[in-house]
Amino acid sequence: MELGGPGAPRLLPPLLLLLGTGLLRASSHVETRAHAEERLLKKLFSGYNKWSRPVANISDVVLVRFGLSIAQLIDVDEKNQMMTTNVWVKQEWHDYKLRWDPADYENVTSIRIPSELIWRPDIVLYNNADGDFAVTHLTKAHLFHDGRVQWTPPAIYKSSCSIDVTFFPFDQQNCTMKFGSWTYDKAKIDLVNMHSRVDQLDFWESGEWVIVDAVGTYNTRKYECCAEIYPDITYAFVIRRLPLFYTINLIIPCLLISCLTVLVFYLPSECGEKITLCISVLLSLTVFLLLITEIIPSTSLVIPLIGEYLLFTMIFVTLSIVITVFVLNVHHRSPRTHTMPTWVRRVFLDIVPRLLLMKRPSVVKDNCRRLIESMHKMASAPRFWPEPEGEPPATSGTQSLHPPSPSFCIPLDVPAEPGPSCKSPSDQLPAQQPLEAEKASPHASPGPCRPPHGTQAPGLAKARSLSVQHMSSPGEAVEGGIRCRSRSIQYCVPRDDATSEAGGQAAGALASRNTHSAELPPPDRPSPCKCTCKKEPSSVSPSATVKARSTKAPPRHLPLSPALTRAVEGVQYIADHLKAEDTDFSVKEDWKYVAMVIDRIFLWMFIIVCLLGTVGLFLPPWLAGMI
């Protein structure tokens, strides 16, 4: 059937009637309920006095059940010693003037009423540090038909708390919140603990603190101002700091700075960066202290453990600078500025290195020492062998009975002229004239070239000889030519290559000061002297030779030329200078080794002290059960 057809007017009145009936019933029910609460409020507060205690008799005591629920631990201020919390204060009491029969008010068993309209106990926070002792936000109270009143206002309290930062950041604090009536004594209002512990069901976890325990206790106290006894309920909060933030940003950097201080003593003194490293560590620690002054609790009641550790680290770094300066002073000492005492040599070169398991490196200048010794022997050994006057050269009895005969050189192609001379090999040394040879050795017969007395000096590998030829005396001249007599000067070369090179340079310097031509030819190279040599027949019997050897005559050296004498003196000076430098070098090395031993001593000392300081930082909180 279409809407608006002939049957539409017949159905519309019944629908409207049903809708109107439903609306009337609902409105009547709401009106009845609102009318019941309104009548109840008028009945309860007609003649109600909120200033009087809700007791029938004046001697009755109002029992207030008290409880606390914590919502958030906002902050713990170590500097101002305050704890800020967000709590719900639970209070419950009975008011006999606020009772009714639910049957008279359409089964209304409870209503919410403004708390300003009823009597409230004046319970405040005794140890408040902010000024708001009482609850500032007055919420509505829940009123029941039997006169029971429940009131749970929220509040943010700043309570005083004695902060102990001895083990900071591994500390644990005990803070209290004391609640009680400010006006009424125990005879008027008595408190009953609603729960033995603080309700933490709605607690919002903190990122810095964790509540270990929170217990409420009932106490009574008589104050000096009044004769009455006042009850209170004190809640003790045991809170522990979460140390992760401070461990990463405070403790670990301090430990690393201490380790850098230890490494100062492991750094060699030769690098010259020990003082730089010490100053850098000290500056970094100073900047670090400026940054953490806001983190460490600024209280003078007790020094925090981390503050003691930072002070220890500062002293640690300062001492390292002082010790490093002393070590560098010892390292750069020399024989020209300081004399090493015997006890220093005994303690720091013998005793302490053995205790520290230190092994001194081997001597560095062995080659130079061998070179100096060889040059000393070259300068002090006789270049010509001594000969007794009027006798053949004497030898020891252990040698052969037939000494080598001297060799005489007769020039073949040199014509006999007045005052001729025989050249030396490679023209390095001028030959002596006959008169000089006669004056030098008028009666002695030339002896063979022999090695120096005794065994060969250590460090010498082989001997080389420098042959010097001079004319024989006129009485020794033979027919058909001029007889020459040769004598050789031996010099030795060290074994090592470096020493051989230095020895060769010294020998070359000697030769260059006495010659005007090239170097000497090698020993195996044939001599350019155009003389033929033959052995002089021995005119002395073997028995006479043995007898001559048994007699001792004072040795006599052949005179050297002035140039050769100056060369020998130069070699002697060079050898003495090198010996003095070697002695200075040895003393300097001793001082450097003493500095290294002192460094090693303080390295182990600082490692031990650093470990003890670290253990001292963590051990007390661990023993106290805070870690």
Curated annotation (Swiss-Prot):
<feature type="signal peptide">
    <location>
        <begin position="1"/>
        <end position="28"/>
    </location>
</feature>
<comment type="subunit">
    <text>Neuronal AChR is composed of two different types of subunits: alpha and beta. CHRNA4 forms heteropentameric neuronal acetylcholine receptors with CHRNB2 and CHRNB4, as well as CHRNA5 and CHRNB3 as accesory subunits. Found in two major stoichiometric forms, LS (low agonist sensitivity): (CHRNA4)3:(CHRNB2)2 and HS (high agonist sensitivity): (CHRNA4)2:(CHRNB2)3, the two stoichiometric forms differ in their unitary conductance, calcium permeability, ACh sensitivity and potentiation by divalent cation. Cells produce predominantly an (CHRNA4)3:(CHRNB2)2 nAChR.</text>
</comment>
<keyword id="KW-0564">Palmitate</keyword>
<feature type="glycosylation site" description="N-linked (GlcNAc...) asparagine">
    <location>
        <position position="57"/>
    </location>
</feature>
<dbReference type="GO" id="GO:0007271">
    <property type="term" value="P:synaptic transmission, cholinergic"/>
</dbReference>
<feature type="disulfide bond" description="Associated with receptor activation">
    <location>
        <begin position="225"/>
        <end position="226"/>
    </location>
</feature>
<dbReference type="GO" id="GO:0022848">
    <property type="term" value="F:acetylcholine-gated monoatomic cation-selective channel activity"/>
</dbReference>
<keyword id="KW-0732">Signal</keyword>
<feature type="modified residue" description="Phosphoserine">
    <location>
        <position position="538"/>
    </location>
</feature>
<dbReference type="GO" id="GO:0035094">
    <property type="term" value="P:response to nicotine"/>
</dbReference>
<dbReference type="GO" id="GO:0045202">
    <property type="term" value="C:synapse"/>
</dbReference>
<dbReference type="InterPro" id="IPR038050">
    <property type="entry name" value="Neuro_actylchol_rec"/>
</dbReference>
<keyword id="KW-0106">Calcium</keyword>
<dbReference type="GO" id="GO:0043005">
    <property type="term" value="C:neuron projection"/>
</dbReference>
<dbReference type="GO" id="GO:0005892">
    <property type="term" value="C:acetylcholine-gated channel complex"/>
</dbReference>
<feature type="lipid moiety-binding region" description="S-palmitoyl cysteine">
    <location>
        <position position="271"/>
    </location>
</feature>
<comment type="similarity">
    <text>Belongs to the ligand-gated ion channel (TC 1.A.9) family. Acetylcholine receptor (TC 1.A.9.1) subfamily. Alpha-4/CHRNA4 sub-subfamily.</text>
</comment>
<dbReference type="GO" id="GO:0051899">
    <property type="term" value="P:membrane depolarization"/>
</dbReference>
<dbReference type="InterPro" id="IPR018000">
    <property type="entry name" value="Neurotransmitter_ion_chnl_CS"/>
</dbReference>
<feature type="transmembrane region" description="Helical">
    <location>
        <begin position="275"/>
        <end position="293"/>
    </location>
</feature>
<keyword id="KW-0472">Membrane</keyword>
<dbReference type="InterPro" id="IPR002394">
    <property type="entry name" value="Nicotinic_acetylcholine_rcpt"/>
</dbReference>
<keyword id="KW-0407">Ion channel</keyword>
<feature type="glycosylation site" description="N-linked (GlcNAc...) asparagine">
    <location>
        <position position="107"/>
    </location>
</feature>
<dbReference type="InterPro" id="IPR006029">
    <property type="entry name" value="Neurotrans-gated_channel_TM"/>
</dbReference>
<feature type="binding site">
    <location>
        <position position="78"/>
    </location>
    <ligand>
        <name>Ca(2+)</name>
    </ligand>
</feature>
<feature type="transmembrane region" description="Helical">
    <location>
        <begin position="243"/>
        <end position="267"/>
    </location>
</feature>
<dbReference type="GO" id="GO:0006281">
    <property type="term" value="P:DNA repair"/>
</dbReference>
<dbReference type="Pfam" id="PF02931">
    <property type="entry name" value="Neur_chan_LBD"/>
</dbReference>
<feature type="glycosylation site" description="N-linked (GlcNAc...) asparagine">
    <location>
        <position position="174"/>
    </location>
</feature>
<keyword id="KW-1003">Cell membrane</keyword>
<dbReference type="GO" id="GO:0035095">
    <property type="term" value="P:behavioral response to nicotine"/>
</dbReference>
<keyword id="KW-0449">Lipoprotein</keyword>
<dbReference type="Pfam" id="PF02932">
    <property type="entry name" value="Neur_chan_memb"/>
</dbReference>
<dbReference type="InterPro" id="IPR006201">
    <property type="entry name" value="Neur_channel"/>
</dbReference>
<feature type="transmembrane region" description="Helical">
    <location>
        <begin position="601"/>
        <end position="619"/>
    </location>
</feature>
<feature type="transmembrane region" description="Helical">
    <location>
        <begin position="309"/>
        <end position="330"/>
    </location>
</feature>
<dbReference type="GO" id="GO:0007274">
    <property type="term" value="P:neuromuscular synaptic transmission"/>
</dbReference>
<feature type="region of interest" description="Disordered">
    <location>
        <begin position="382"/>
        <end position="479"/>
    </location>
</feature>
<feature type="disulfide bond">
    <location>
        <begin position="161"/>
        <end position="175"/>
    </location>
</feature>
<dbReference type="InterPro" id="IPR006202">
    <property type="entry name" value="Neur_chan_lig-bd"/>
</dbReference>
<dbReference type="GO" id="GO:0045211">
    <property type="term" value="C:postsynaptic membrane"/>
</dbReference>
